[in-house]
């Protein structure tokens, strides 16, 4: 009996084709596994209780406004870079980081800009300076910061008043003793203390067009005045009384000029 290879091959192909159709049909009708979605959003704000410029609720609202709040969205559709860029537009955010983990969590980590000085200028401008001497808008934030008042434009605030503030804040004594910096029309600097009913005048700040030298120049000048003032506090006011003088002028190197309080 002669074996029919052609017929056998056709039968084999038919069987294979049929099996493929069955498998393909079964696969087509099998319910697809759902794409993983974001089950949790973790928002971590560094120094939230200390600075308080932004809250997790405000971050959520900002992302919802842009329709990019990730909760319940498919993980593959969540763009971490877009979230970072959106939050980075806030004037109170310093750095942002967003990433996804396999458990369905989207992590958002932010650092806030650190305010160091509040400016309330005579021209009506009201804003903060941060630790990089950049301007921050006014907000609901409240803190025990030194306030700078008077004839201050934004350039002078960033390039000179900021260095006065940072010098005061660098000292445990002066950051608690001085509550206000006042800039006179001729750019002379007055300091208002917390203890003692007097005004301190330290003179006009030294100026330079060299940006890299400016901070050291102002810092050295202010520290020299504060060192002399602290000695006067210790050896003068401690005996004469904290409220004897209404005005203390430490502008000049070789003398301290005091104006007695008018008791009438």
Where are these regions (language model features)?
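Charged, solvent-exposed interaction patches on well-folded alpha/beta domains
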Residues: 1-47, 52-58, 62-264
């Amino acid at each position: 009996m002669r074996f029919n290879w052609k017929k056998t091959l056709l039968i084999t192909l038919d069987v294979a084709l049929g099996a493929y159709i069955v498998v393909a049909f079964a696969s087509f009708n099998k319910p697809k596994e759902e794409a993983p979605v974001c089950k949790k959003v973790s928002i971590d704000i560094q120094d939230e209780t200390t600075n308080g410029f932004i809250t997790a609720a405000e971050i959520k609202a900002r992302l919802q406004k842009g329709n990019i709040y990730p909760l319940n969205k498919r993980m593959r559709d969540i763009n971490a870079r877009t979230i970072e860029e959106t939050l980075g537009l806030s004037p109170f955010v310093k750095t942002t980081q967003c990433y996804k983990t396999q458990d369905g969590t989207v992590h958002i980590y932010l650092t806030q800009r650190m305010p160091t000085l509040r400016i309330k200028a005579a021209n009506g401008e009201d804003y903060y300076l941060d630790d990089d001497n950049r301007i921050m808008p006014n907000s609901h934030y409240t803190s025990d910061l030194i306030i700078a008042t008077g004839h201050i434009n934004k350039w002078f605030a960033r390039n000179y008043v900021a260095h006065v503030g940072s010098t005061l804040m660098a000292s445990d004594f002066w950051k608690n003793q001085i509550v206000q910096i006042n800039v006179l029309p001729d750019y002379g600097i007055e300091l208002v203390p917390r203890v003692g009913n007097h005004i301190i005048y330290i003179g006009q700040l030294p100026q330079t067009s060299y940006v890299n030298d400016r901070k050291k120049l102002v810092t050295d000048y202010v520290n020299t005045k504060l060192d002399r003032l602290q000695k006067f506090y210790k050896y003068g006011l401690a005996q004469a009384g904290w409220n004897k003088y209404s005005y203390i002028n430490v502008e000049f190197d070789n003398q301290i000029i005091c104006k007695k309080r008018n008791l009438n």
